[in-house]
Amino acid sequence: MSVKDIEHEHSYIKAYEDIQLLKQDVMRPVRMELEVMKPEIYLQRHHIEETIVCFGSARVREEKEAKGKVKAAQEALAKNPGDKNLQHRLYEAEGLLKLAPYYEAARKFANLVIEHAGDRFAVVTGGGPGLMEAANRGAFEKNGKSIGFNITLPHEQHPNQYITKDLAFLFHYFAIRKLHLVMRSKAFVVFPGGFGTFDELFEILT
């Protein structure tokens, strides 16, 4: 075998550059440690020491958008009154419209955190849409530090646009994500949400 052939063998890749190696089950502890350390390095770099954490639904939208979804569902159902899927779509849209005021509540709460605490606290969320977006938006609007700890889900969840540069993080392990949510926290605020929000709430309570 030539030297060139040897240099192209998979075993010759440096371990820390070998993605195939890092994805093996046996390397899970290393991956978990990386998920602990990467955000930690960035948070220290930005001098983040204390946080206020906001939990809440990813599905709740601003009232204007929520009303638009109800209207669209009503119009679709009017064309096919017997369609069960469209009936359920309208039911869901109406339910989310009732929760829409919490979007503004989360945004204003984060406004107040930054207005009164300045640089002392950063606002932290799960980094996704809905009420997480609202809280990040509130901090962002007041030029505060706005952090998002997102998670890989079966359905893709994009980060919201109101997270401070270099403070959006994507996790694979829920446990490590929760660790970072708790580590620097001084207070938690829980807005309406689903199973994910309840899971986070009871994790904190216990």
Feature names for model-found ranges:
Residues 65, 198-205:
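Glycine/threonine-rich flexible loop motifs
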Residues 107-111, 182, 205:
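Predominant activation on well-ordered alpha-helical scaffold segments within soluble catalytic domains
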